[in-house]
Amino acid sequence: QALSYTIDVYQHKIKPTHDIVAFFAFISFFPQLVAGPIERATNLLPQFLVPRGFSYDKAVDGMRQILWGLFKKMVVADNCAAAVNLIFDEYQTLGGTHLFLGALFFTFQIYGDFSGYSDIAIGTARLFGVNLMRNFNFPYFSRDIAEFWRRWHISLTTWFRDYIYIPLGGSRCGKWKAMRNTLIIFLVSGFWHGANWTFICWGAFHALLFLPLFIMGKNRKNKDVVAQGRLFPDIKEVCQMFITFLLVVIGWIIFRAENIHQAWDYIMRMVTRFDFVLPAHGKDPLIYIAILLVVEWFQREKQFGLQIEEKGIFRYQAVRWTLYYVLFITTLLLAGQQEEFIYFQF
């Protein structure tokens, strides 16, 4: 974040600030300091240079986003984490269905964990009258890998785009150099997560999925919301989302594995030993995942899952507060064993 300020000043995108309080508030704003969103000086710093008053509507919206973030973290991510740890630790003794569930649970563990933190951070910032950039845009409803990366960890991917990809020449330096630049971005994205070959391979895996779309000029095809203005997607969209989701799940196996051998062994066992036998216990996360997907599907054109327009049935304050209390109590009752936020380690 401090680096973005230096670069933006150097590139004359923003003037150097002489307000030391505003500058230190920018680089140390606590809601998003640990795990994002990674803010730009052009967006966040000017908000500390002007007077801000308390906004009731903004605070209410912030509390809604905090509540939804807590649900994603405490109910979805933490309950998935217990099953994920068990399955990945004992994967060599389990059947393919168990292994697929382990991969599925980790897919939603990392989403609930990371996007939940982002929701909490963005909501907390709103209580202070500060607007942070959106970090997740319902990525598991993507129709191809390019769309997934426009919706996943938006603050980091756009940071890499603006400060690495474009300075390298972007896509205006010829197709081969543009492909090279794209590959570099994905490898840097993997290396950013840690000095483990699994992260590098995860980045390379996504690069291999992205580059064919880039070569065919289809990497910016799906920029709208899936099934926009419709209740359900069509068959083509369902197939696109399903295939994209499976590819993302495979990528998360590589990301979660301790080493490359384990990742390959896990995937091979999952495919060759698939037995269609559901485990007798540990299926509760499926219910929480289903709730998450249903809510976010119907809210996919909004900023976050609990963003409510005060009209229709929600124009009544009693209805809104009942919803808040039900979700809050449900989160407390169904919360899994407390787990540290995954992205605290990166």
Regions found by a protein language model. Name each.
Residues 2-345:
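Membrane-embedded transmembrane alpha-helical bundles that form the catalytic cores
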